[in-house]
């Protein structure tokens, strides 16, 4: 096969994936950016070019800034917790423990449940006076508390649900990485007299860095795309205390029908995710050993 034939064959193999990527990713992104510079047609008013007006509106929108702040706190609360719990569970079920298969199933089960089902399960836990959490705290002598109806606890309650949902998913990747490691490494460390903690810190965790980067990227994306739990459990309340960026975009676009402003919000969300991804690869990729 000639070089030109190889080149043509390679591009033909890539063409279906490139077409799907362009159709469902690149074109919507470019169309959203274009739409963010225009107004939303309403009634007899046609679409007009407004330039950066939609972006200027962001600076004067207090709900946007609150949603952005909520999302940043949500990310800071869920990403480290879900990753640490996933790593702990993976190390636990990778060892020789009784009922290892049952533990793996139990840890992974929340991942396969639909998001709406998970939200409804936790609604039962958080129900005032009758919920499981209320029954437990009441037995300990604590006063009744509306967990999802209080601004001080509503966002934290969503964080708990998210960590419970995602930790099992991330555990699978850590478990696969642990099982791909050579057992001779642990044997050599034991001969040298290294403790388990020293072996984990100096050998295991550095070898897990490629997996950690992959999990971190997914955790950041998940933290900024959550909308199901918010819709079912709080609808952004109380007083926008649990309104996250994607939920706010959903409200602007489909409740208030302001598609142009929603497009501008979407571009801000894409910019936040892009900057987060660049920062992760810039700081972590240089510390990763792939071989």
Placement of each model-derived feature along the sequence:
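A structural signal for multi-pass alpha-helical bundles of membrane permease subunits
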Residues: 6-291
């Amino acid at each position: 096969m000639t070089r030109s034939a190889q080149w043509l064959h390679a591009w033909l193999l890539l063409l279906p994936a490139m077409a799907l990527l362009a159709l469902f990713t690149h074109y919507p992104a470019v169309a959203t950016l274009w739409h963010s510079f225009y107004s939303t047609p309403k009634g007899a008013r046609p679409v007009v070019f407004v330039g950066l007006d939609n972006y200027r509106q962001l600076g004067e929108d207090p709900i946007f800034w609150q949603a952005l702040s909520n999302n940043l706190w949500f990310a800071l609360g869920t990403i480290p917790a879900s990753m640490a719990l996933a790593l702990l569970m993976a190390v636990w079920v990778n060892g020789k423990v009784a009922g290892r298969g049952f533990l793996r199933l139990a840890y992974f089960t929340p991942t396969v449940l639909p998001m709406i089902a998970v939200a409804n399960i936790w609604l039962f836990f958080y129900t005032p006076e009758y919920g499981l959490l209320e029954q437990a705290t009441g037995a300990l002598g604590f006063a009744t508390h509306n967990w999802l109806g209080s601004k001080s606890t509503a966002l934290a309650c969503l964080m708990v649900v998210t960590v419970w949902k995602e930790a099992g998913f991330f555990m699978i990747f850590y478990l696969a990485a642990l099982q791909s490691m050579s057992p001779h490494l642990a044997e050599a460390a034991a001969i040298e007299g290294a403790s388990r903690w020293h072996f984990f810190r100096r050998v295991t965790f550095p070898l897990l860095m490629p997996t950690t980067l992959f999990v971190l990227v997914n955790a950041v994306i998940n933290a900024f795309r959550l909308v199901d739990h918010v819709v079912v459990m709080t609808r952004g309340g109380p007083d926008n205390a649990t309104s996250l960026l994607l939920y706010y975009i959903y409200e602007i676009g489909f409740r208030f029908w302001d598609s142009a402003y929603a497009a501008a919000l979407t571009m801000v969300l894409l910019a936040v995710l892009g900057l987060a991804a660049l920062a992760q690869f810039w700081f972590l990729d240089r510390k990763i050993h792939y071989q």
